[in-house]
UniProtKB/Swiss-Prot annotation:
UniProt-listed Enzyme Commission number(s): 2.4.99.17
Organism lineage: Bacteria, Pseudomonadati, Pseudomonadota, Gammaproteobacteria, Thiotrichales
Stored HAMAP family: QueA
Keywords: Cytoplasm, Queuosine biosynthesis, S-adenosyl-L-methionine, Transferase
GO cellular component, as recorded: cytoplasm
Function: Transfers and isomerizes the ribose moiety from AdoMet to the 7-aminomethyl group of 7-deazaguanine (preQ1-tRNA) to give epoxyqueuosine (oQ-tRNA).
Domain of life: Bacteria
Species per Swiss-Prot/TrEMBL record: Francisella tularensis subsp. holarctica (strain LVS)
Localization, UniProt: Cytoplasm
MF (Gene Ontology): S-adenosylmethionine:tRNA ribosyltransferase-isomerase activity
SUPFAM superfamilies registered for this protein in UniProt: QueA-like
Protein name: S-adenosylmethionine:tRNA ribosyltransferase-isomerase
Amino acid sequence: MKTDDFDYKLPEELIASYPLENRDASRLLKLNKQTGEIADYKFTDFIDFINPGDLLVFNNSKVMLARLYGSKTTGAKLEYLIERIKNPKLFETHIKANRSPAIGSEIYVEDTLAKVLDKDGGMYLLEIQGDKDIYQLMEEFGHIPLPPYMKRDDEEFDAERYQTVYAQDLGSVAALTAGLHFSKELMQQIKDKGVDIAYITLHVGSGTFKPVQVDDVESHKMHAEVISVPVEVCQKIRQTKENGGRVITIGTTSVRSLETAGQNGQIEPYQGETDIFLYPGKKFNVVDAMITNFHLPKSTLIMLVSAFADKEKIIKAYEHAIAERYRFFSYGDAMFIF
C-alpha cells in the first residue's frame, strides 16, 4: 500500500484559515460507509442523525498556549513549541533556531532562564531555573499554535475558537478539530434528546502535522500520544453495545483512543501512551460511526478514515467536497461517516 494512494489535489482557497462566525454553522457531508452514498447537510442537522441509546464520545483535551519565544544568552532568537509537560519546571519542546542550543547550555524561555538537559532527535528536554513555571509562562506569554497551513499568526479570537467548548484537561498542541463544530446549544440539544455523552482524553502532539515520509504505508512509525480511557467510559460503551446503540466518536483522536483500549476485542480502561496506526486492512472493534474534519493529503488521518470507510469511498467523498466548495482542515467543515 503506497502513501501516494492517499494523495489528492486541493485548491488552496478551500483551506479554512479562519473559523466561521458560529461554531455550528459549518457544513456536514454525510457518508454511508456501506453504500458510499453521499449527502450534504448543515452541521446542526447532526442532531437528526443520532438517537436515544447512542453514545457520543468526545476528547476533552485542552490546547495549550504552546508557542513561546526566547533567546540564547548571546541574544540569538529562539522559538518554542511545547510538546509535553513532565512537571511544572520540566518539559519537552521543539526549538526553532539558526543553530541548535547545546546540551548543558542555558537559554531564555521568554523572560526566564532554562537549562537544556537533553536532546532526542528534534525534541529538547528543558528545566526552568527561575521562579516561574511553564504554566505561568504560557499563561503570560503563550500563543495558540496554529498549524502551518493556515499561514498566519494567531489572533485574539483563536484562544477561544481553536478550543472546544468542553475542553478541560490541558495538554494538546493542536485542536480537536471535529469538536470545534459543537456549540453549547448543540451540546444541550444532544442531552435533551436522550443521547448519552462520554469523555476520554488524548493529548494531541505536534506529530499530528507530520507528513508520512515513507513510500510504504506499513513502514510509517506513528508518534506516541498520552491517552486516558476511564472505567466509566468503558462501562457506558459496553452498555450501549448491549442495548443496540451506536458508539459515535467525535474526532480521530477519540477513535484512536477507543481502538487502543479495545485492541483485544473487548474495551478495557487504558491509561498511558498510544502509537496505534489505523490504515486500510486494520479492524475497528469499538467505533460504529464518527464525526471528523477533512484531512491533509497523504496524512495518517486520511488513512484512518479510509480504513473505516474504504479508500475509494473516501476519495470520492473528498472529490465531492472539493466540487461543492467545502472548507478543509482545522477550521473547515466536517463529515459524518456511519
